[in-house]
Swiss-Prot record:
InterPro entries named in the record: Glyco_hydro_13_cat_dom, Glyco_hydro_13_lg-like_dom, Glyco_hydro_b, Glycoside_hydrolase_SF, Ig-like_fold, Ig_E-set, Malt_amylase-like_C, O16G_dom_2
Quaternary state and interactors: Monomer.
GO biological process: carbohydrate metabolic process
Class of this enzyme: hydrolase
Protein EC: 3.2.1.135
Protein name: Neopullulanase 2
Domain of life per record: Bacteria
Gene field: tvaII
Alphabetically ordered keywords of this record: Calcium, Carbohydrate metabolism, Glycosidase, Hydrolase, Metal-binding
TM ranges: none
Cofactor requirement: Ca(2+)
Active site (UniProt): D325, E354
Organism: Thermoactinomyces vulgaris
Keyword Hydrolase: yes
Positions with a binding annotation for substrate: H244, R323, H420, D421, D465, R469
Length: 585
């Protein structure tokens, strides 16, 4: 047993409360080194002579180097001490505690979770756990009111190829008109990229945080949109651009006019005066040298209060949550206060950050409920679209990503295939619809919350920005209606099968050579097995039936029964076919 590879800490994603009397603990060990992992635990103040409770830690998954184990400690009090008992392949056993490793329990020490406070139990909105999110880029979704079209509005056409300065006239009235379409699709929440006043088509350079952009409509129209969506059971999530403002934002205009005498000079990161908006700016911006997007100094109390007032205003209009742009470049203290504010106004409001990398620093229950899961997207691109990785590597990447976060966060990560910032996934697949469908099936069944970028469901293509922002195709004869029906069916299954929204996830099969991948999601006695043939040829696979699973499984997409024999399921899959199998009592 390689002791140097064994890791645990009594915090973060390795020890976190599920409730005031339940603690989830994880342990990492070298792959294949530990065959049994037990956790012995008691109240922190229990005497050494008292009998310890035992919990068996099951294997949560593996990556290329490590196995990960998880146990749920059912605690009699809110104070916990615990030690691991690890057994190797040859029967060798060792205790592992805060002091280190020892053959004697008393010499290994104990890990301690001092006290489980109710305020530290990470909770997320119940509705979000079962949500299917649909992302709308308002300028390109639907034009419902031509009277507010900006000058130079271009023709809304299937073959449109937008430029960075293109406008097509999409607006909020257009979204209202298309709510029946979205309801038919089955989505339960709409995420809007920015809708506040701004000179650009994308609106990430905010001029007025308290006004709807006139090209999109007005406040009464927005309120109608919220009411109509809510009537259909659809939530509304807005984009908050608090990392930076636009160069037409009132405070920045004041700095441009008054220079060092401006009362707002400390709202921004200005190096010297006068302020220069040339290609070489002397102030911090979004990304690198983007003059139209000056970075806000969010640790400034005045900036913080202004942005909090913005959040209050829009929540008073009835929105259900926020997606936070460039969230990883805003200070943590700001987000902690933001969470307290938002949850005080609406405990059921959802807070989602835009973070493209490991977001564990923001997902411990004190800042965000979720993030846009770009780690998921990277793995999905390389497995389904480009074929850069095989099934075994894919499984390893998924496991490693799951272990980054508490299960409350992992359950609600926004699993996206593409967005307004990326190439369309169908384009990434080289237009291969079979590959695309297989990835969508995975997205709709895997742990997390599916996020659909507008138009994916009817087969829209597009390279990177601005091509990924083409106007939505509304003529049915130009839409891929078969793909639309495929999305509808998968969303319907997701809503119907509790395992797909509430279940844990365990790897079932990962064949490096055949590129076959399977996983199982379980809640109580309900199992859903998902089997994916990520190869352009017909293949047969034998799967061991999970211990608690029955012999007969239902193919949810065909309605046919699949019968196990001698503890195995024999399945034959067409090229790029996915199967969703249900087994329960």
């Amino acid at each position: 047993m390689l002791l140097e590879a064994i890791f645990h800490e009594a915090k973060g994603s390795y020890a976190y409360p599920i409730s005031e009397t339940q603690l989830r603990v994880r342990l990492r060990a070298k792959k294949g080194d530990v065959v049994r992992c037990e956790v012995l635990y008691a109240d922190r103040y229990a005497s050494p002579e008292e009998e310890l409770a035992h919990a068996l830690a099951g294997k949560a998954g593996s990556d290329e180097r490590f196995d990960y184990f998880e146990a749920l400690l059912e605690c009699s009090t809110k104070r916990v001490k615990y030690v691991f008992l690890l057994t190797g392949p040859q029967g060798e056993a060792v205790y592992f505690g805060e002091t280190g490793f020892s053959a004697e329990r008393s010499k290994a020490g104990v890990f301690q979770y001092a006290y489980i406070h109710r305020s530290e139990v990470f909770t997320t909105p119940e509705w979000a756990k079962e949500a299917v999110i649909y992302q709308i880029f308002p300028e390109r979704f639907a034009n419902g009111d031509p009277s507010n079209d900006p000058p130079g509005t271009e023709q809304w056409a299937k073959d449109a190829r937008p430029r960075h300065d293109s406008f097509y006239g999409g607006d909020l009235k257009g979204v209202i008109d298309r709510l029946p379409y979205l309801e038919e699709l089955g989505v339960t929440a709409l995420y809007f990229t920015p809708i506040f006043a701004s000179p650009s088509h994308h609106k990430y350079d905010t001029a007025d945080y308290l006004a709807i952009d006139p090209q999109f409509g007005d406040l009464p129209t927005f309120r109608r949109l919220v009411d109509e969506a809510h009537r259909r059971g659809i939530k509304i999530i807005l984009d908050a651009v608090f990392n930076h403002a636009g160069d037409q934002f009132f405070a920045f205009r004041d700095v441009l006019q008054k220079g060092e005498q401006s009362r707002y000079k400390d709202w921004f990161f200005i190096e010297d005066f006068p302020v220069s908006k040339t290609s070489r700016t002397n102030y911090e911006t979004f990304a690198v040298q983007v003059p139209a997007m000056p970075k806000l100094r969010t640790e400034n109390p005045e900036v913080k209060e202004y942005l909090f007032d913005v959040a209050r205003f829009w929540m008073e209009q009835g929105i259900d949550g926020w997606r936070l742009d460039v969230a990883n470049e805003v200070d943590h203290a700001f987000w902690r206060e933001f969470r307290r504010l938002v949850k005080s106004l609406n405990p059921d409001a959802l807070i989602v950050g835009e973070i493209w990398h490991d977001a564990s620093g923001w997902l411990m229950g004190d800042q965000f409920d979720s993030v846009m899961n770009y780690l998921f997207r990277e793995s999905v691109i390389r497995f389904f679209a480009t074929g850069e990785i095989h099934a075994e590597r894919f499984d390893a990447e998924l496991t490693r990503a799951r272990m980054l976060y508490p299960e409350q966060a992992a359950q609600g990560l926004w699993n996206l295939l593409d967005s307004h910032d990326t190439e369309r996934f169908l384009t990434s697949c080289g237009g291969n619809e079979a590959k695309f469908r297989l990835a969508v099936l995975f997205q709709m069944t895997y742990l997390g919350t599916p996020l659909i970028y507008y138009g994916d469901e009817i087969g829209m293509a597009g390279a990177t920005d601005p091509d990924c922002r083409r106007p939505m195709i509304w003529e049915e004869k130009e839409q891929n209606r078969g793909l639309f029906e495929f999305y509808k069916e998968l969303i319907r299954l997701r809503h119907r099968l509790a395992s797909l929204t509430r279940g844990n996830v365990r790897s079932w099969h990962a064949d490096k050579q055949a590129n076959l991948y399977a996983f199982v999601r379980t809640v109580q006695d309900q199992h859903v097995g998902v089997v994916l043939n990520n190869r352009g040829e017909k293949q047969t696979v034998l799967l061991q039936v999970p211990e608690s699973g029955g012999k007969t499984w239902l193919d949810c997409l065909t309605g046919e029964e699949v019968h196990g024999k001698q503890g195995q399921l024999k399945l034959t899959l067409r090229p790029y076919q996915g199967m969703i199998l249900w087994n329960g009592r």
